[in-house]
From Swiss-Prot:
Native source organism of the sequence: Mus musculus (Mouse)
Residues bearing the modification Phosphoserine: S90, S94
Entry protein name: Cytoplasmic protein NCK2
Keywords: Acetylation, Cytoplasm, Endoplasmic reticulum, Phosphoprotein, Repeat, SH2 domain, SH3 domain, Translation regulation
GO function terms (MF aspect): phosphotyrosine residue binding; protein-containing complex binding; scaffold protein binding
Major localization listed first in the record, in broad terms: cytoplasm
């Protein structure tokens, strides 16, 4: 008979998804599946669900190797097939998954265009899945209530576990501590004597996921003191309070090289207006080669909800981005130019004008709560 494995909760955790389980510090749990970053456990009330593996520790036995692998070796089991759900009705090839499913017909939300931050790396196991790179951004195009979302990254489209990402469009998630936040602002070291590589300003709020990471609010100025070679998507920074930790580099913009200036002398952002050169020169909504940070500043300084601008993509020279003024947080949507067709999410347009006119009448963004955003007018 296979020995039961007991794990002890190291911290409290509140479930964020239907497939997850609330746990309390020092609670005893039975380990059912440890084959993923998230472990499936059972509590004393016989409820089962997934919890972050770094929130629990083993109490007995099987400390080496995977519990699932040991069970498979013992019982000769193969892969467990996920019960059919709405995801299997996707036009893309259906697959089996080893990730939590509700076991019943799942609801789907289509035609989304929501940016999301990748919290954990994920390697696609099937042809219709999407590999995720920690610290990168993906565009969520479709949601299925079985715990899987469909999105795009670097021109690839596929399914991935929803709790591996954090929606940037979710204002509550942006303003509250992230679901894996441990101790905010935990310092790796005091950073004394470290050479300052850059001075950066944060573009968005961020809550630490691990003890090595550094939490911050939008608009903070920090010093970059190290760029780890083994984790190029993250920079080691020191904030104004002397706390040091890792931050996602695409959450900051470089203001200058070298030591920080006095806070009262933070560089000012010059006026940003429509571009007189570039693909759409002369259009009132085309701002050309401006950064996301400059677009944010312009929208915040002069815009009202619904104002928008279109700019050249920073990551792909031939593509574009739509920046939209919204309550709480501004929204940014990537527009890919493929064979003279403008693609935003799953929709395609023959011209940028057609795209703009479409999203003046149809929502460019719809939240899970029914909030709809439109392109109202070009930023003045």
């Amino acid at each position: 008979m296979t020995e039961e494995v007991i794990v002890i909760a190291k911290w409290d955790y509140t479930a964020q998804q239907d497939q997850e389980l609330d746990i309390r510090k020092n609670e005893r749990l039975w380990l059912l599946d440890d084959s993923k970053t998230w472990w499936r456990v059972r509590n004393a009330a016989n409820r089962t669900g997934y919890v972050p593996s770094n929130y629990v520790e083993r109490k007995n036995s099987l400390k080496k190797g995977s519990l699932v692998k040991n069970l498979k070796d013992t019982l000769g089991l193969g892969k467990t097939r996920r019960k059919p759900s709405a995801r299997d009705a996707s036009p893309t090839p259906s697959t089996d998954a080893e990730y939590p499913a509700n076991g019943s017909g799942a609801d789907r939300i289509y035609d989304l265009n929501i940016p999301a931050f990748v919290k954990f790396a994920y390697v696609a196991e099937r042809e219709d899945e999407l590999s995720l790179v920690k610290g990168s951004r993906v565009t969520v195009m479709e949601k299925c209530s079985d715990g899987w979302w469909r999105g795009s990254f670097n021109g690839q489209i596929g399914w991935f576990p929803s709790n591996y990402v954090l929606e940037e469009a979710d204002e509550a998630a942006a303003e509250a501590p992230s679901f894996l936040s441990l101790r905010r602002g935990t310092a790796l070291s005091n950073g004394q004597g470290a050479r300052v590589l850059h001075v950066v300003q944060t573009l968005y709020p961020f809550s630490s996921v691990t003890e090595e990471e550094l939490s911050f609010e939008k608009g903070e100025t920090m010093e970059v003191i190290e760029k780890p070679e083994n984790d190029p998507e993250w920079w080691k920074c020191k904030n104004a309070r002397g706390q040091v930790g890792l931050v996602p580099k695409n959450y900051v913009v470089v203001l200058s090289d070298g030591p920080a200036l006095h806070p009262a002398h933070t560089p000012q952002i010059s006026y940003t207006g429509p571009s007189a050169s570039g693909r759409f020169a002369g259009r009132e909504w085309y701002y050309g080669n401006v950064t996301r940070h400059q677009a944010e500043c312009a929208l915040n300084e002069r815009g009202v909800e619904g104002d928008f601008l279109i700019r050249d993509s920073e990551s792909s020279p031939s593509d574009f981005s739509v920046s939209l003024k919204a309550s709480g947080r501004n929204k940014h949507f990537k527009v890919q130019l493929v064979d003279s067709v403008y693609c935003i999410g799953q929709r395609r347009f023959h011209s940028m004008d057609e795209l703009v006119e479409h999203y003046k009448k149809a929502p460019i963004f719809t939240s899970e709560h029914g909030e709809k955003l439109y392109l109202v007018r070009a930023l003045q």
